[in-house]
Amino acid sequence: MGEALDKEYVLHSYGRNYVQFTQGKNATLWDSEGKDYIDFASGIAVCSVGHGNERLAGAICDQAKKLIHTSNLYYIEPQARLAEKLVKLSGYDMRVFFANSGAEANEGAIKIARKFGESHEGEVKRYKIITLESSFHGRTITALKATGQEKMHHYFGPYPDGFVYAKNLDHVFKLVDEKTCAVLLELVQGEGGIEPQDREGIKKLERFLKERGVLLMVDEVQTGIYRSGELFASQAYGIVPDVITVAKGLAGGVPIGAVMTTLKDIFAPGDHGSTFGGNFLSTRAGLEVLSILESLYQEGTLQKSIDRFSAELRALCVEFPSLFECEVGLGLMRGIRAKSAEIQKSVIDEAFKKRVLVLRSGRNTVRFLPPLTLSEREMQEGFSRLREALKGI
């Protein structure tokens, strides 16, 4: 019934698996037949505090009984408190704009870059934004154009001008010219193979751009909100970006996005806006998520989970050398590089048969994005099932 209903009335923009999940608790999901699954995907890095989190559910229910939405024409206390929390926890001297998704956050960042470029005092206006060829920044038209993967650009042109693609980090330095206003990049590419950028290279780029008055904008839609082991991967890299974009895990499943910038006065009233962005419900959820994850971080629980998960992935590479090359990633944004795209697909398919949810990334990487609240029992059960799946490949 569910599959027929979906195919009849919902646009076919997703390659769905028609399992029907009905309930979840932390990193465990149950389907309509009562079968349990270990979730190493978190709804693509969204369910940062797991499924059915009582604290998050309580905060959402409490807020929903009071106010959900009034619009940004009026003061929204949880919005201001969440902005304060993000700024103070990061240690960055920034202000925050709230949106509803990662794509919207990146659109906001691009508008900041373009206004910054337009405001440049010189004969040549700056408008070019450099991104990487294997990047992914969203599916709205401008964010899609910022995405450097040519395969993503079919059918939807003409696109906005002004985007330039670098082959790699070293190539960025060669592309910066007098018309460049910003560089937008991911420190770990979620759709590009989970390969972290070189730390010294990023620091060198930060200095290079600062000397030339070009903005460094970091897309932390997937790496942000403790997924990297720190609040932001930028902190782990020891850099201070001019702009950071956030979404996915910030509200644990409630739609939210955010743009943080050191350009605290870049927007004037009317320059940018969002009807739903920063509403009472999403920002209250964000406050609760940050409170939960901040405690895990401070206690050292998060780092212990990262270390154990990484050790399990490395062990798989040793145990199955015919399938895997190496482990990649940062924090609990991890991957194992398969020896071929065919093996990658087989691993994901066989894992699902054993009721473990994992994802793909790039040409041949199997991606792991478990809830940051993942228990040791769930981790052990998930890897036990995964080993059984791999024996059949």
Curated annotation (Swiss-Prot):
Gene Ontology biological process terms from the UniProt entry: L-arginine biosynthetic process
Residues binding pyridoxal 5'-phosphate, per UniProt: 102-103, 136, 219-222, 275
Residue numbers binding N(2)-acetyl-L-ornithine: 139, 274
Localization of this protein: Cytoplasm
PROSITE patterns referenced in this protein's UniProt entry, alphabetically: AA_TRANSFER_CLASS_3
Family membership: Belongs to the class-III pyridoxal-phosphate-dependent aminotransferase family. ArgD subfamily.
UniProt-recorded name of the protein: Acetylornithine aminotransferase
Species of the source: Wolinella succinogenes (strain ATCC 29543 / DSM 1740 / CCUG 13145 / JCM 31913 / LMG 7466 / NCTC 11488 / FDC 602W)
Encoding gene per record: argD
